């Protein structure tokens, strides 16, 4: 594998939901709810976001997904949390059943969209914010900008604004920051090509389909797998994927770096996926994998340490999408957080 592919594998492995491990096609009666629009809320004239709220009670739990991922990635978690408190998931602009975005998919724009959505839907704080991967960056920025609205956070294998610098430091080739950023350009170019191809329509078996359409997570039941694949036929989805991927470690990282501060006494639980035990890739060495794992754990431990009530847990037998591979651990952390938020009143 070439250097560019190596970099892309490192970075994107921590952004999107994998399609592999875990119990497959879990039986969940509520699954079909995620396969169709629920409440389409207008956040600005002519643009709507899909919102799905179930359950009752305060604080309201808000779910934010990984990069360009739909709300359906929480199908094994949200219904169970809703037995304890109100729980709301949503599709970001262009993802799932939401309308296309009108601006870049940076964390600042995502936070602004989410706040508009909650206001229009009359969902009042306090909130327990739950973010997976890129969603972890988004909910952290929400807290930094609006701390009085947040009662607690659960960060599910969250991406981190400093992770690309960590990867650069692990590279044996001594790249400058500018050179390192440039290594991601071919991936962004591919996303642009997918936007163009989506406007024409994808045909299974073609090169464009292979490059642009990803399998649904294997844990999803067939009804959600079909919806996941149908989502990827939409030009709006590929535009969202392009703008979020272009923003996550550029504009979004800068926004987090500028805004970040102590969580003070805010309850925070950080969940980290288990160490990778799969065979080494052709670009990996045992030392590199060990260093990469240590860096990831250290970044997550730092997030927990930013709170006087922070907890960091490594979830056994999990992959990056812990909510799919080990949903029990995520449900338990959220319910624990809801209880802490209620006790703090």
Question: What name fits each language-model region?
Answer:
Residues 63-64, 90-92, 156, 169-175, 180-302, ...:
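Alpha/beta-hydrolase
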Residues 124-170:
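Conserved hydrolase catalytic core segment
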Residues 68, 92-96, 135, 160, ...:
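Alpha/beta-hydrolase active-site loop signature
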Residues 28-48:
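N-terminal cap/lid segment of alpha/beta-hydrolase-fold proteins
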Residues 43-97, 145:
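Conserved HGGG/HGGXW glycine-rich cap/lid loop of the alpha/beta-hydrolase fold
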Residues 52, 89-134, 146, 171-172:
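Active-site loop/oxyanion-hole signature of alpha/beta-hydrolase fold enzymes
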Residues 306-345:
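Catalytic active-site module of serine/aspartate enzymes centered on a nucleophile-bearing elbow/loop
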């Amino acid at each position: 594998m070439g250097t560019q592919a190596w970099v892309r594998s490192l970075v994107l492995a921590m952004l999107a939901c994998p399609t592999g491990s875990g119990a497959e096609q879990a039986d969940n009666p509520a699954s079909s709810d995620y396969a169709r629009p629920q409440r389409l809320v207008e956040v600005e004239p002519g643009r709507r976001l899909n919102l799905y709220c179930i359950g009752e009670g305060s604080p309201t739990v808000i779910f934010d997904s990984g990069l360009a991922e739909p709300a359906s990635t929480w199908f094994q978690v949200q219904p169970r949390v809703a037995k304890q408190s109100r729980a709301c998931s949503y599709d970001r602009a262009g993802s799932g059943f939401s309308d296309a975005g009108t601006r870049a998919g940076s964390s600042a724009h995502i936070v602004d969209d989410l706040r508009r959505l909650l206001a229009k839907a009359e969902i009042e704080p306090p909130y327990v914010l739950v973010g997976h991967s890129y969603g972890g960056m988004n909910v952290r920025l929400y807290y930094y900008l609006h701390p009085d609205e947040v009662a607690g956070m659960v960060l599910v294998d969250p991406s981190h604004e400093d992770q690309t610098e960590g990867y650069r430091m692990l590279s044996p080739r001594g790249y400058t920051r500018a050179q390192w950023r440039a290594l991601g350009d071919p991936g962004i170019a591919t996303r642009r090509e997918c936007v163009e191809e989506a406007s024409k329509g994808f045909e299974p078996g073609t090169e464009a389909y292979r490059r642009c359409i990803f399998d649904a997570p294997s844990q999803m039941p067939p009804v959600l797998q079909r919806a996941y694949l149908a989502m990827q036929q939409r030009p709006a989805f590929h535009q969202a994927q392009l703008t979020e991927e272009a923003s996550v470690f550029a504009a979004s990282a800068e926004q987090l770096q500028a805004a970040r501060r102590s969580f003070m006494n805010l309850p925070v639980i950080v969940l980290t996926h288990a160490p990778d035990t799969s065979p080494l890739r052709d670009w990996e060495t045992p030392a590199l994998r060990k260093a990469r794992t240590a860096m990831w754990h250290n970044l997550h431990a730092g997030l927990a340490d930013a709170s006087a009530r922070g907890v960091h847990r490594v979830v056994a037998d999990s992959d990056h999408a812990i909510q799919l591979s080990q949903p029990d651990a995520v449900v338990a952390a959220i319910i624990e957080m809801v209880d802490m938020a209620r006790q703090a009143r």
